[in-house]
């Protein structure tokens, strides 16, 4: 690859780093966990952060166990 190509690649990577939202960089690792309904059957609405969608998504939660990527409200998930 030519030096011009390398400089272009470096510039694009730098731009991508700058434009990546700070909130997604600072999210704890449990936000990478998938939505987990859990083994119980007390079905209720809950929210989890989707790294693929870069937003909080509603899902049906069974009411027990599951994992740490589980929030009662959209507001809790987004903070």
Curated annotation (Swiss-Prot):
Annotated compartments: Secreted
Protein name (record): Kunitz-type serine protease inhibitor microlepidin-5
Organism encoding this protein: Oxyuranus microlepidotus
Tissue specificity remark: Expressed by the venom gland.
Physiological role: Serine protease inhibitor.
Keyword tRNA processing belongs to the record: no
Domain (BPTI/Kunitz inhibitor): residue spans on this chain: 31-79
Alphabetized GO MF terms: serine-type endopeptidase inhibitor activity
SS bonds (residue pairs): 40-64, 56-77
């Amino acid at each position: 690859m030519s030096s011009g190509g390398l400089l272009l690649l470096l510039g694009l990577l730098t731009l991508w780093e700058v434009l990546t939202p700070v909130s997604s960089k600072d999210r704890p690792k449990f936000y990478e966990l998938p939505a987990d309904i859990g083994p119980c059957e007390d079905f209720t609405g809950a929210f989890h952060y989707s790294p693929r969608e870069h937003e909080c998504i509603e899902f049906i939660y069974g009411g027990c166990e599951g994992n740490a990527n589980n929030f009662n409200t959209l507001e809790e998930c987004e903070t």
